[in-house]
Curated annotation (Swiss-Prot):
Involved in the oxidation of myo-inositol (MI) to 2-keto-myo-inositol (2KMI or 2-inosose). Its EC number is 1.1.1.18. Signal peptide: none annotated. This is Inositol 2-dehydrogenase. It comes from Pseudomonas fluorescens (strain ATCC BAA-477 / NRRL B-23932 / Pf-5). One of its GO terms (biological process) is inositol catabolic process. It holds the Pfam family GFO_IDH_MocA_C. HAMAP family: IolG (MF_01671). Transmembrane segments: none annotated. The keyword NAD applies. Keywords: NAD, Oxidoreductase.
Amino acid sequence: MSLQLGVIGTGAIGQDHIRRCSQTLQGCRVVAVTDIDPQQAARVLAGLTLEAEVYPDGHALIQAPEVQALLVTSWGPSHEEFVLAAIAAGKPVFCEKPLAVTAAGCRRIVEAEIAQGRRLVQVGFMRPYDAGYQALKAVVDSGRIGEPLMLHCAHRNPRVGENYKTDMAITDTLIHELDVLRWLLADDYVSVQVLFPRKTGKAHAQLRDPQIVLLETARGTRIDVEIFVNCQYGYDIQCEVVGESGIARLPEPPQVQLRSAASLSSAILMDWKERFIAAYDVELQAFVDGVRAGRVGGPSAWDGLAAAVAADACIEAQQSGAIVPISLPQRPALYA
């Protein structure tokens, strides 16, 4: 029997997930939606020729008896409220990032889930579901390159809008690396420093771009991440793990190699959706399959908290220029 989903928020990512659950994934169907603009929700359903109930608000949808599990894809500051309500109702919930806009909010969610005594929350960090990252982790975990000593990473976007501010390089961009690199190494961060190279002339006046984030883990691995959101040439994600006896590199997305006019070339993607579209499919299918099997896996509320704590330290490091410690409380048994 199909898992009956309710979706809170029908903006761009909400629409994409509704389409995905209705047309691509197996074992689920969207039976209820809500949005701050009910007419927007109705338009999304009509555009997908989908029959589902439009509820006046997220709380009404969460309490709806036909809704068995939730997708929270609304405005970021509303996530904590709806995730806590879903936990209180005992319903599994997939929450797009951020889990909450503050580390304190993430802690409240962790505490509520612990009080329930079981995992109900999966956070929408999709990179661990990317085939390239999974292959890279398999090499790291196998020991073929020895212990990881250093990571060299980059997160580059062709350009960003005028509303993109310096701290968003952490909260909107680096947040993906903060999650996936911790997963890749199975290691927590202990400190961070942020450096600002010469500013690109392509950035608007209020944005300092590029940035270099230097992280250290509990086991002593050093990580440098270049954040360059006005690189012009494409959407480019790089990750190289330097081990004791070898180097492992994240594979490039498969593209046709072209030999023509005395040159050898292959295309670079321009959009993050193209780069990770398969990972989005896999992560949501994993959520659906897990709930149907009576469990929730994937990135947890604890992982959401870890990313938020690290992000707060990164922003402090942006502002101070100092090396800032990153301190997580002891991991609760629920997330062991």
